[in-house]
Amino acid sequence: MSSLDRKKPQNRSKNNYYNICLKEKGSEELTCEEHARIIFDGLYEFVGLLDAHGNVLEVNQVALEGGGITLEEIRGKPFWKARWWQISKKTEATQKRLVETASSGEFVRCDVEILGKSGGREVIAVDFSLLPICNEEGSIVYLLAEGRNITDKKKAEAMLALKNQELEQSVECIRKLDNAKSDFFAKVSHELRTPLSLILGPLEAVMAAEAGRESPYWKQFEVIQRNAMTLLKQVNTLLDLAKMDARQMGLSYRRANLSQLTRTISSNFEGIAQQKSITFDTKLPVQMVAEVDCEKYERIILNLLSNAFKFTPDGGLIRCCLSLSRPNYALVTVSDSGPGIPPALRKEIFERFHQLSQEGQQATRGTGLGLSIVKEFVELHRGTISVSDAPGGGALFQVKLPLNAPEGAYVASNTAPRRDNPQVVDTDEYLLLAPNAENEAEVLPFQSDQPRVLIVEDNPDMRGFIKDCLSSDYQVYVAPDGAKALELMSNMPPDLLITDLIMPVMSGDMLVHQVRKKNELSHIPIMVLSAKSDAELRVKLLSESVQDFLLKPFSAHELRARVSNLVSMKVAGDALRKELSDQGDDIAILTHRLIKSRHRLQQSNIALSASEARWKAVYENSAAGIVLTDPENRILNANPAFQRITGYGEKDLEGLSMEQLTPSDESPQIKQRLANLLQGGGAEYSVERSYLCKNGSTIWANASVSLMPQRVGESPVILQIIDDITEKKQAQENLNQLQQQLVYVSRSATMGEFAAYIAHEINQPLSAIMTNANAGTRWLGNEPSNIPEAKEALARIIRDSDRAAEIIRMVRSFLKRQETVLKPIDLKALVTDTSLILKAPSQNNSVNLDVVADDELPEIWGDGVQIQQLIINLAMNAIEAISQADCETRQLTLSFSGNDTGDALVISVKDTGPGISERQMAQLFNAFYTTKKEGLGMGLAICLTITEVHNGKIWVECPPAGGACFLVSIPARQGSGT
């Protein structure tokens, strides 16, 4: 026989092997071989030793069990003939080829599949290697076969590959959808421009033919033209976005004077600046020539200036400057004295469809594309745009553009047949302002008895349109937002309120809420206008607070008809209220109920559809299992989540009873709870219980069970909501195990601190035993022997040996690692053992220890060792506190008693130490909190854990006389338990 001495390989080349030395075995080597065999069989992965020809010499136990093989079956036989490789002839041939390669001196490593699990009945993937091992002469004598189970890794890799493929498909789908969206925008924009051209062209011809502003239709023509231009701008913007998304947006470079371009664009805003009393300051050089796309440069300046004018309050300041920045760059800055832009939003404002709203400012209507377009156009020019705080407050936008076009780009000369100077633009198109609309909210004294209608709408043109539709039949006054409307209503209540939903300062739904809160206004009928087609919002408003809901766009005829109905009902209600005022009837309530009932009837189908859609969405997409059962607990319906949790398909659950999914030991309690629920003896209940899955496994869940609302005569339906908490339970179990380990480690550490005291306690009886043994020997050695004295010496030896044995028994019991087992605790023995353990440390620290216990103590169930550990931890803390504080009175009192009702054991650990501050008390039981220079701060946290395991409580009190008193309450328990 010989043993193997491994040496580290000297060469990590292709021929990678170990050198070995052969020695004769002695007894020491045999022992080492036995140890090696134990380690070899204890290895978790596949390990085998082959001779140079690939015949099996040794294989570890794990590999043998995985393949369902015994070593005697394969020892001395070719490795590739073993059961592991009998998946197919190809697998066997591959393994034979690998062995031949390794036998030639080459290290082999690859991933293979073998029959390596469930006794050779299951295929697993293995990271397999063959390492040639040579002797001192360089001859190959062994092949070391090693394998690591990578089945889970392979599955994960396959799943990852599948997910990556799905992700690639999703990305491709998104790309196609994005292209389709851009194509759709482009086509729709082109299609819309044709009818818009046919609106604007004839309109301009009609306006040119009319007799100027004296024409009775001039105002309507202006409204049509202004809104058609606004729509055309939005269509052009969408078309630009589609081109940019399709990377079809190019630049038409031209040598131009940026100063002249900027000056001309800025001049279009001077009228608006004067109208709003805004100081508009421009600082431009005489000339700055650059190669830019003039049209896109104009759009950049227009959008930045319109943005500044939107947010700058009346009397504010706006600056537009142009200057050189670094070599070959133009810097455009636009600053305002508005509310500014918070740093957190400075990236978002350049995103598409993002609108920044500022409370108290004029409405910022629009598409939210202005700054996005600016950023896109700037980046097309290879420039940059940024926003920061303006000096003195407000926003400061800075645009940097290169003065020269990229090398190779075509640049048109300033004499090319395009306009040399930018055209004058209509700034209303960019600011979305209607002229002369500032004083619309002013209310003139009403001169007639016509019903009053208040219109609340932030769009001036829409306000004017509604006012024109109704002014012939009603006294109409208007407000631009909810706050102004509320102020007007308080002074002059209308007979009808017509309000838009989305407005600045105060929205329409907030206005409705405020109106309904005021008793003097609560009877006013309300009509809501909205461009948002939201069925759920519509149902909510109609059912709770408003009388009508009208979607934009609407016809003048429909508006008049609806207004007439609501005003007629209001006038009739007022007349009835006046007629019946002496009878004390509240006709307003009756009228409100009548209107409310009518609208409930009208909207019932819509509400039902919305409710069913919400329920279906919750039912099908909820992560919790939802099951409907009949009174016999047979399954009527189960949602996909429940099917996924239990592994049953929809067809599997047809006719199945929930009892069949319930473990037999839980079935009686489940039946009783359901019976109580059906008989009215119990309300809705929740319980933690287990379920049997289709594959035979068990899951844990929180089950909430209740009765569904039912009509008279209908059979009851039970709703069960199941929340899978299997992983949570496993995590809790792992946490409990960790807590048990922590408690044991703490117990060991405590006993380590007691080592000196225990040695002292054992040394005393051992010394007495030696003394009495010597004395007994002398008494027996006398002539004649003194038998009585010798017997007394032996009795003392027995007494002292019993004392030493009791101390050792107590230490072994305290250090024993075991699961928490709840059983009756011998409290007298517990008190005695604890007193014995604490005797030495209290004496060594000059602390007077008193242990007081009632004659009759409640019987408690628990883990005696853990309760003892809890008491010792508290007592040692007290001894240490007394010693470090150098107290005059050094007293520690342990007391054991029943509480007032006799249903709990109360343990008190009271000391005369320095006490505990209020700040310390708040963190006292937190893990890792300590007031000591040394220590982990885990002692009291472990005490809390032990108390909670026993369903008890622990708290601390500070007596007026000083010191600290820790109290532990452990409930008494009837019956038996584990």
UniProtKB/Swiss-Prot annotation:
Modification sites for Phosphohistidine: H190, H760
Q: Which PROSITE patterns match?
A: HIS_KIN, PAC, PAS, RESPONSE_REGULATORY
The known PTMs are summarized as:
Autophosphorylated. Activation requires a sequential transfer of a phosphate group from a His in the primary transmitter domain, to an Asp in the receiver domain and to a His in the secondary transmitter domain.
Pfam annotation, one family? HATPase_c
Q: What is its EC number?
A: 2.7.13.3
This protein's UniProt keywords: ATP-binding, Cytoplasm, Kinase, Nucleotide-binding, Phosphoprotein, Repeat, Transferase, Two-component regulatory system
Q: Report the residue ranges that make up the PAS domain in this protein.
A: 32-103, 611-681
Entry-annotated residues carrying 4-aspartylphosphate: D500
Indicate the segments forming the Response regulatory domain, all copies: 452-567
Q: Keyword Cell division, does the record have it?
A: no
Domain notes from UniProt: Contains a basic region leucine zipper dimerization motif at the N-terminus.
What is the protein's name according to its record? Answer: Sensor histidine kinase TodS
